[in-house]
Amino acid sequence: MANIAKKYAKALFDTAKDADILDDMYDEFSTINEAVQSENKKLQALDADPQKDVEQRRRFVSIVFGQTNQYLQNMLTILASNRHLGHIHEIYIAFETLYNEEHNQDYAVIESVYQLSEEELSSIEEIIKARTKLSKIMITNKINPELIGGIRVKVGTKVMDASIKNDLAQLERQFIRVK
């Protein structure tokens, strides 16, 4: 489904960009994604229910998502027709990735032993921006006492580990090689 999700996301992204409503589309799709998170199992059950024909699934979309913009509603109707409503979250993730690339931004998770101050987070954000060339970073600070000290930063698929735990692990590997 990952490839299918990317195709739906790309089509919606391109359509929104061409119509000059990309930011509005992102906001609206984010709202829908949040709303369906807790109902995903029900959507998958609706997809799998052989007693629900195409028209019933389309009517469901029209009733539940009738207030959304036309492009998003069209995509949701196609998802209903193809029994893919249970994949809204995957499509949203792929759409969000495209949106973040377009706006040169990404999420960063900063793990530390204690809650970092706004000043510390701001300093780390500037370092991340310099290393990744991103213009905007959305930061989450997670507490991880296993690090012993220091921080570990995850941005996309990249990890920058400046923790004492990592330093000790590297020392251990060096000692093993020396033997």
Curated annotation (Swiss-Prot):
It comes from the Bacteria. GO terms for cellular component: plasma membrane; proton-transporting ATP synthase complex. Its main location: membrane. Keywords: ATP synthesis, Cell membrane, CF(1), Hydrogen ion transport, Ion transport, Membrane, Transport. It is found in: Cell membrane. Coiled coil: none annotated. Signal peptide: none annotated. GO terms for molecular function: proton-transporting ATP synthase activity, rotational mechanism. It is a peripheral membrane protein. F(1)F(0) ATP synthase produces ATP from ADP in the presence of a proton or sodium gradient. F-type ATPases consist of two structural domains, F(1) containing the extramembraneous catalytic core and F(0) containing the membrane proton channel, linked together by a central stalk and a peripheral stalk. During catalysis, ATP synthesis in the catalytic domain of F(1) is coupled via a rotary mechanism of the central stalk subunits to proton translocation. This protein is part of the stalk that links CF(0) to CF(1). It either transmits conformational changes from CF(0) to CF(1) or is implicated in proton conduction. F-type ATPases have 2 components, F(1) - the catalytic core - and F(0) - the membrane proton channel. F(1) has five subunits: alpha(3), beta(3), gamma(1), delta(1), epsilon(1). F(0) has three main subunits: a(1), b(2) and c(10-14). The alpha and beta chains form an alternating ring which encloses part of the gamma chain. F(1) is attached to F(0) by a central stalk formed by the gamma and epsilon chains, while a peripheral stalk is formed by the delta and b chains. Belongs to the ATPase delta chain family. HAMAP family: ATP_synth_delta_bact. This is ATP synthase subunit delta. It comes from Staphylococcus saprophyticus subsp. saprophyticus (strain ATCC 15305 / DSM 20229 / NCIMB 8711 / NCTC 7292 / S-41).
